Structure formats: structure tokens, C-alpha cells
Amino acid sequence: MVMSNVFICHHSKDVPKLRDLLDKLKAKGYTVKSSSLQEDRDNKVVHKGKHVADATVARYIRSAIRWAGTFIVLIGEHTHERPWVNYEIRNAHFQGKKIIGVYVHGCAQDAELPEAYKRYGTSPIGWNSIDKLGGMIEGKVEPAELPDGSASNGNIYQMIYIKCK
């Protein structure tokens, strides 16, 4: 089994669950980075008390995603509202990364998936199915789940059809 570098994308309100997931992945031997950056009340990234330019944040995120073999999106009730989350997912897709969604423990059944995840992500799994994550990182395909870990009807993807000439 080859261990993979893993990048975790998340909403800042889900940091406690992020820490739980980081601990579980590290215990299994994975090297993990996350998109955790210090933000002020206006959701602007700060470092040593100063605002950081969006271009600098974007460069950091692209670099961290490039480093990773697998990209995980921690999906909470408000994850879909964050522009940086969609930015990170799109970048992971453009860099050819496997994109796996994990619902936050206790997440509402009707948690909305980020738009970019609907387009580029794999089948999401519930927090109670976190043991499946290692297999998914290694390429195993799992059926889509709802936040509680029960089977989804599978209708989560926006299908885009093109006609080739």
C-alpha cells in the first residue's frame, strides 16, 4: 500500500471535525495538509496581523493541491457558500486530483454540495463511513452516501453532455 499526500478543503466553521479527520488519516500513515488559514471577522486571510492578498492565498492553495495526490472536501452545512471552497475544488480538478467528499458528522440530511464538487467530485461518503476513506484514496469506488452514511439515490452529479463532430 503506497501512502498518499492528502489535502483537505473545508469551511472554517468545521475546524473541529477537520482536526478529527486529520488525526484519523495521520494515524493511518497519510501525510496531510489543509486549507486552514487564519481569517478576520470579514473573512479576509490574515498573517501576523496583516491582511494577505487573495493572489497570495490562491498561490498557496495551488501549491498545496499540487503537492497532494488526493483532495478531500469536508462537506458541512455551509461549505457550499464559500467561494474559496469552489476555487480549491476547481483547481484540484484542473490538476488531475482525485476529489473525495466527506460529510461532517451531524450534518443535516439536506446539506448542499458545493457547485464545483457536483461537477468534479466522486461519490461523497458520510462521516460514519470514514473507514472507507483509505480505500477511496487508493482508488476503490464506493457508492454515494447521505450525511448519515445511508445510501444515496445517486442523483448528485450534474451531467454535462457534449456532441463531438
Question: Can you say where each PLM-predicted feature lies in the sequence?
Answer:
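A short helix->loop->beta-strand "cap" motif at the edges of active sites that frequently abuts
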Residues: F94-I100
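Inter-motif core of Ras-like GTPase G domains
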Residues: A68-V73
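Short catalytic/ligand-binding loop motif for oxyanion handling, primarily in non-cytosolic enzymes
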Residues: V15-L18, E81-P83, C107-E112
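Conserved N-terminal substructure of TIR/SEFIR domains
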Residues: M1-W67, A151-K165
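Conserved TIR/SEFIR loop-to-helix hotspot centered on a Trp-containing motif
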Residues: E77-F94
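C-terminal interaction surface of TIR/SEFIR-family domains
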Residues: S4-F7, V52, G106-K165
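Short, structured coil segments at secondary-structure junctions
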Residues: K28, Q95, Y117-G121
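Short beta-strand/turn micro-motifs composed of small residues
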Residues: H10, I75, Y103
